[in-house]
Regions:
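Catalytic-core regions built around general acid/base machinery
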Residues: 42-54
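Asp-based, Mg2+/Mn2+-dependent phosphohydrolase catalytic module
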Residues: 24, 48, 60, 64-65, ...
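Surface-exposed cleft-lining segments at the edges of enzyme active sites
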Residues: 28-36
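Transmembrane alpha-helical core positions of polytopic small-molecule transporters
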Residues: 36-37, 93
């Protein structure tokens, strides 16, 4: 049975609040924090430069369409993305190939033509194993998890993407 990301987040929060004896009245306040995430300082400028170079920009996320659209709009980024792909279209989470198929099919492109960025090592590995050109956004100089895949590139900020592409 499929549950969307928001429901899983709520369920996990309920269990965590119970385990740590956190007042249930705080639940909505804590959930609302997901809706006010802000991008890093260089993100908007980098996306604008990529759009000027005519790159197609998209989000591919386990998040729900409602949450993703709200975050993009609240940060003034809605005109910078060509698409927002949510796993809700296929009702299965990454790293299922059905998720990664979405942009490949929509744009009729080869897997390796997709530059797939993430700060999560498991996410980079999933996209890379699918055949995407994976780029790990490693802002904190972390060590890549011991997974069966290593990213094609590693950057510490999105602005470095301009030189890679």
């Amino acid at each position: 049975r499929h549950k969307d990301f928001w429901q899983i987040t709520e369920d996990s929060l309920d269990k965590s609040m119970q385990a740590f004896n956190i007042n249930k009245a705080m639940k909505n306040e804590l959930l609302d924090l997901y809706k006010i995430l802000s991008p890093y300082p260089e993100v908007k400028e980098t996306l604008e430069k990529l759009k000027e170079k005519r790159y197609k920009l998209a989000i591919l996320s386990n998040g729900t369409p409602a949450l993703l659209n709200e975050l993009v709009k609240s940060n003034g980024l809605q005109n910078l993305f060509d698409d927002i792909f949510s796993i809700e279209e296929v009702k299965i989470y990454k790293p299922s190939s059905k998720v990664y198929d979405m942009p490949v099919k929509k744009y009729s492109i080869k897997n390796e033509e997709v530059a797939f960025l993430s700060a999560n090592t498991w996410d980079v590995s999933g996209g890379g194993n699918y055949g995407f050109t994976s780029i790990w956004v490693n802002r904190n100089k972390n060590i890549f998890d011991n997974l069966d895949y290593k990213p094609k590139n590693e950057i510490s900020g999105l602005n470095q993407l301009i030189d890679i592409l």
